[in-house]
Amino acid sequence: MKKYYSLICALLLAQGAMAIDYDQLKKSSKINVASKIELSKLQTQEEKTVVQSKATGSRLKALQKQMDNRTVRAIVRMTPGSDASTLAAEGITITSVVNHFAIATIRLSQLEKLAERNDVESISFGKRRKRLLLNKAHKSTGVDKIHLGTGLTQPYTGKGVAIGVIDDGFDPNHIMFQDAEGKSRFKMICQSEEENKPLTYLTTPAEIAAFQTDDQNESHATHVSGIAAGNCQNSTFQLQGVAPEADLLMGPIPYYDSDYEMFDKMVSWCRENGNKRLVLNMSYGANAGSHDTTDPEVAFMDEMIKKYDIVACIAAGNEADLDIVQRHTFTGGSDETMKAAFYSDLDGDDEMDVTEIYDYITVTQPEKQIEIDVVVFNTNTGTAKNTWKFVNSTHPDGREYPYSNTNFHGKVSVQSEDIGNGMKGYLLAITDISLLNSNCSLGYVIRGKEGQTVTSYLESTSVFDTEVPGCGNHITHDGTINSIACGTEPIIVGAYNTANSYKGADGNNYTFQDAFYGYKYGNKVGDITFFSSYGKLADGRELPHVCAPGLFIESSFNRYTDNYEEDVMKELTVGGNKYEFGQMSGTSMATPYMTGICALWLEADPTLNHTQIRDIAQQTAVLDAYCNTNNYYTKQNDGNQAGSGKVDAYAGLKYILDQKSSVLSPIADNKRFMIRSLSNNTFEAYTAGAVAMSAALYTMDGRLVSSASQSGNTIQVSAQGQHKGIYILRISDGKQSHVQKVVVK
């Protein structure tokens, strides 16, 4: 078929028809590797269409023109200082411009000319494989000290701030997101109705009320949104997220880079509705990427964050325990190789369940020619049954080819691109896998030159099979960090444990071992969670920045799926509607904690920029013994899995209010004062700007039972030894007094 199609294309090109020269396009250094993979798919689609049509003459030319007019939606990166909007003069439809980046709809026939422009640096339109990455957690992060506790003040709830959740599996009319009038607190629903097409937006209350869900198989987004900003206050059940009065906006996971146009819409909504600050939550990720700022998706996100001063929180990833990173520095040995095999049977049922494999390989000193062979290994002996040479002096930038033999049926492609820090990247894609013999494993053999460091980032749809002889060397877990999280502007969030069990709706208690059988590390309360990804990047940065609660977190479930029934913790029926709440674990759950905390901090001081918010999170984080203890996998000189430590919402808020009061910035009286209950019936009060404070605790009939005074803006008073009940706490800073009912337990 391909030979016949190639003859047709050659004829059409010779006649001046509009046939696309795909092979020439894939050689362009301006089209990134994921887009080259997409071009191959478009080429295959065209081959089938043309051959099956049996068209000739004018009918064939018309069909070819139709193929050429197919469109892709891309991020176009131009040289800094260029006006990206000028692309419209070429007949290209522009939907978003961020400095020298544009999101554009481009006809295939326009790609070659666009790539030839001197002011165009890169074009990215490939589909990227991405995966979805409360009670006890509130106390550990200090959120309860800000707005929870019987009879205590609730000054900060995220009011006046918008939270944009980019995810999958939304139920925006769940009781967790209803206001006092029963209306959804979601103000915008952005959805992808057709792959690689412009997104659609719902913004009216009627449209949002009529919306059910974007995905009947998933509950992830509903759970994440509940952690960040949910608020269920039913008479029989209460569960509150971190920022329960923040406005909510929802958007789909951007499988195509161009889907990031939704950020523009969210920013516009914020500006048109009180100039609110925007905090974004991205609890999804991918590992097969360059892990640097040259990644088109990462670079565009950085520019968007800087332009609009968005606070963006991104999950670190859940792969710290997986064998998905291999790294080796070659010493120049004559037979030195870097070998790896891929698992194809992940669930151990002796049946192949991996139909596509994506692996991104970075290489230092790219002026030295590297060699990459794709291999079918004998899983028992580690010997090569088939070897195909994909990168060498003959094919320095890779190639693609379909294979069909007694061991393997599928398509193999290796594409290259120049990336940051003087490195080159290769994307290995093995797709359409329809046969792999039971005693065979796909993999690679890499040969490098002395001094070259090669790092392989495998997408976790598979993992390295370290049991194949000779293929278990050079595995590291430093680098499991989410590739999408490698920008310079977001806050990257890892996970730690605030619980090691949960109670199901069936009344049974489920432990760590029930959920994660066989794991004997990272399972204690306080531990950095065993799966929390981390990594030291080529530019020296270490991620994540901070950690937040991520194990057995309770939140809302999507009513339109039953895929999470085993994780349900509570069922609630209101007005004939059944609502479910349950647990999930992951850095996906830790990230909305950080997102909600950012909303609280921005409510306290909306003038803080995104960099200051991140700095405060790191400066006030708790770096305890658990954070300083390497996890099971970390090795000497690895990045720090805990980052700067465990986020402390209360300490961060106090820091912000202290800074405001020190420069005489106005703080409303009802926002200056906070009180929290500590252990052993001790109460702590804080007043922004105070230089000295006094506290007195009275019984309800006015009898003084405890008092204290001290300099500074924080004071503690003890109720130890007092009977259980309600007491009156009076706090004074010499200028004003606060009277509050408190409960002694």
Set out the residue ranges of the language-model regions.
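C-terminal outer-membrane/trafficking sorting elements
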Residues: 666-745
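Short acidic, glycine-rich surface-loop motifs adjacent to enzyme active sites
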Residues: 246, 267-292, 315-316, 445-450, ...
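Subtilisin-like serine protease catalytic core
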Residues: 20-21, 149-259, 274-277, 289, ...
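Autoinhibitory N-terminal propeptides
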Residues: 5, 18-154, 161-163, 175, ...
